[in-house]
């Protein structure tokens, strides 16, 4: 009987030790999760203030603690993606590749949110892979409860623009605007589609709408100027082109517009 009691006592002691270890492990895991989320939130704050270097430092700290968190990987991808666009109008291909790698890593996680699919589709568009971009954006639209369909439809429309399928492109931009009527990208790209389809009056309207919702939208001013010029409305075209130069004086767009303005001199 003493032997039995001793063995039971030993078993209880070992089990108590296991419980204590598990509780300590859970507490440690929760603490790590909290620390990682703190870095993640700080990275988001830096990103919203365009402090990209500090944002990247913080999200890498979060990923050191939790390397498989889809939210952190998406944040890292966005930091790279924001830095793809260079002042002279060219793309930083290294950042573009890093953004794609981070999005692909995020998509390998079971809990990746649908926003990863749409943001990744943007990168695929920049890499001139429209068919893959369409697939990604369509996958996002199939996720129950996805609350930003306008962005997905806009990216699908841009993909069709790149493929030269203007009617399909216009259809998807209109769908985007059904969900979010004040989305400047959808208005601008619908203007491009209408221009290609020869529907210039509608194109002018859409470029004006894009500019109304985002007055600093350089591409929309450029598109407006071009279609106004096609319509023979030279004074209005000149005003649109001058706005391009004012908004982006050192860009390739501005250089091209300056040449066009020479032909508009009275």
Model-predicted regions and their roles:
Residues 31, 65, 109-110, 143-145, ...:
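Structural marker of alpha-solenoid helical repeat scaffolds
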Residues 75-78, 119, 155, 189, ...:
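Canonical tetratricopeptide repeat
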Residues 222, 226-266:
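Terminal, low-structured helical/coil segments at or just beyond the last alpha-helical repeat
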């Amino acid at each position: 009987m003493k032997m039995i009691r001793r063995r039971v006592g030993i078993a209880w002691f070992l089990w108590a030790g296991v419980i204590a270890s598990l509780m300590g492990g859970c507490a440690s895991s929760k603490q790590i999760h909290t620390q990682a989320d703190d870095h993640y939130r700080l990275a988001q704050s830096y990103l919203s203030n365009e402090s990209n270097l500090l944002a990247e430092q913080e999200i890498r700290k979060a990923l050191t603690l939790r390397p498989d968190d889809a939210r952190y990987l998406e944040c890292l991808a966005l930091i790279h993606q924001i830095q793809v666009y260079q002042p002279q109008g060219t793309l930083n291909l290294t950042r573009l590749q890093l953004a794609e790698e981070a999005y692909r890593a995020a998509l390998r996680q079971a809990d990746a949110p649908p926003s990863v699919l749409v943001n990744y589709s943007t990168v695929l568009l920049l890499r001139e892979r429209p068919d893959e971009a369409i697939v990604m954006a369509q996958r996002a639209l199939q996720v129950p409860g996805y609350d930003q369909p306008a962005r997905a439809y806009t990216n699908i429309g841009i993909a069709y623009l790149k493929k030269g399928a203007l009617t399909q492109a216009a259809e998807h931009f209109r769908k985007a605007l059904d969900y979010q009527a004040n989305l400047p990208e959808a208005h601008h790209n619908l203007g491009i589609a209408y221009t290609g389809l020869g529907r210039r009056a509608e194109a002018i309207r859409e470029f004006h709408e894009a500019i109304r919702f985002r007055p600093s939208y350089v591409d929309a001013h450029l598109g407006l100027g071009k279609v106004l010029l096609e319509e023979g409305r030279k004074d209005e075209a000149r005003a649109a082109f001058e706005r391009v130069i004012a908004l982006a004086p050192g860009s390739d767009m501005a250089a091209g517009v300056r040449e066009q303005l020479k032909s508009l001199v009275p």
